[in-house]
Amino acid sequence: MKFIVLVLFCAVAYVSAQAELEPEDTMDYIPTRFRRQERGSIVIQGTKEGKSRPSLDIDYKQRVYDKNGMTGDAYGGLNIRPGQPSRQHAGFEFGKEYKNGFIKGQSEVQRGPGGRLSPYFGINGGFRF
């Protein structure tokens, strides 16, 4: 008797499982998650070189180029030093990643004393081994 009930239960489960596999809707699938928008980042960096005064940079960076291992970021923000008024600056960073190294560069413009613009350019690189 128990064996007959078990076989009957398995048969009902099998038939109901087959009925669930049949497609009820032929409507196309619409994804509910939207692609993320590219966003920038806020970077806070403090530096102190040798016996000079410390400085604090607060920047907003936005990635403007990113293909084949090359990147380009535009940024702008404030440079704060104790005892001096804060200075605005803007610049561009670029870089290229290689299999065993990298090369990066930076250009920046900042208002100097008297309101003049003072440019800054730099380049660096490295090898991994």
Curated annotation (Swiss-Prot):
Specify the signal sequence span.
Answer: 1-17
The organism's superkingdom is given as Eukaryota
Which UniProt keyword terms apply here?
Antibiotic, Antimicrobial, Cleavage on pair of basic residues, Immunity, Innate immunity, Signal
Q: What is this protein called?
A: Hymenoptaecin
Please explain the role this protein plays, according to its UniProt record: This peptide has antibacterial activity.
Maturation-removed propeptide residues: 18-36
Q: What is the lineage of its organism?
A: Eukaryota, Metazoa, Ecdysozoa, Arthropoda, Hexapoda
Biological processes per GO annotation: defense response to bacterium; innate immune response
